[in-house]
Amino acid sequence: MDRQLKNFILKGGRLIDSASGLDGQQDIHVRDGLVTEIGADLKADGATVVNVKDCVVTPGLIDVHLHLMNGLGAFGVDPDIFGIGSGVTTVVDAGSAGHSLLTVFRNYVTRTAKTRVLNYINLSTLGGVTGPGYSILADPRLIDEEKIEKAVETNRDIIVGIKIIATGGALGAEGLKPLARARKLGDNLKIPLLVHIGESWNKDAAPVHVGDVLKYLRAGDIVTHMFTAHPGGLLDPNGKLWPQVRNAKENGVLMDVGHGLHNLNFDVARKVLDQQLFPDGVSTDGHRGNRAGPVYDLPTTMAKLMALGFSLNQVVEMATVNAAKLLGRTAELGFIRVGRPADISVLRLEEREWKAVDSQKGTMQARQALVPVYAIRNKTVYEPLPVERP
């Protein structure tokens, strides 16, 4: 049940705010949608007490990669399912809309969602209309720089970058030309590229070498699906990182998990992590086809990274302050501050064994689970939607 509360205190929780270095028991007082006080054992003084004892309180979680145009193709899902319904306050659509659909997206998704929704605009005019496996960049006419630039300038408040699928299936006969065009657009508009790697759909297409993709990326650009087992990933046939990957990371290219239905493989993840290449962000690549598994939600994806060796503090940092950096939104997201609108997630850390499943049905024994308890935006305290998590 969602509650509208004018004056309330989150009482007794462990606050982890990586942006300010806070980690300890702290109460948070919210009045009229703004954080008014943070401190140990605050007095209620007439405020409604929301008991979060034995819970982890964080800045609002940010899921930086989803497909959120409900009813569009095979993927589109209501943003509030992976958003406030999963303890997450900000979600980012990864290219459902090209320039031609962006106004529709804004009117019917962004404005109607209870969750904050941001966008990567698709390089292709088609966006996500066709669904996966189609050559949405194979015809040069499917990229219209002038209209993309106009759409971005009109929607700067929600656009965080340009999405491009760098696979043989998507690029088709155009080869690497769309990447060159995306690079120029990103430079002109001063926004990053979000690049999908891994040929997970069109098995007949020749894979694009990740080294060729990385030639077009600069500091602040993002590679998503860093743990994919599909052709075009970060590892060579011997399980070693391609040298271009290390160079790109050292030069500021960012790496995102992008779990998805196909692109988190535990064996690949272990090999990548063993070579000291770590994710900058954690995301679900959530859509209609993976809510019931293997993805479930962002807290479950964070818990899978914990099973791979990351600490609670590290995954919280990835999903808050690091996510805000990926999006270029550090002035408004990823922290809790007095005087700022309440944007808060509450999770329960459960010490129990459960079987984590990757995108290829590989399993791993996990010993800690993260379960959403609340997502708080301004005056509203949202409870999570029911879902059968592992």
What do the PLM-derived regions correspond to, one by one?
Residues 13, 28, 33, 54, ...:
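Divalent metal-coordination and catalytic microenvironments
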Residues 104, 143-255, 263-280:
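Histidine/acidic residue-rich metal-binding segments in metalloenzymes
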Residues 86-92, 96-97, 112-140, 163-170:
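Metal-cofactor-binding active-site regions of metalloenzymes
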Residues 268-349:
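His/Asp/Glu-enriched, well-ordered alpha-helical/loop segment
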Residues 60-66, 91-93, 117-121, 160-163, ...:
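Hydrophobic faces of well-ordered beta-strands that scaffold small-molecule active sites
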Residues 341-390:
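C-terminal cap of metal-dependent C-N hydrolases
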Residues 1-9, 13-58:
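Histidine-rich, glycine-flanked metal-binding segment
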Residues 44, 52-112:
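Metal-associated gating/positioning segment near the N- to mid-region
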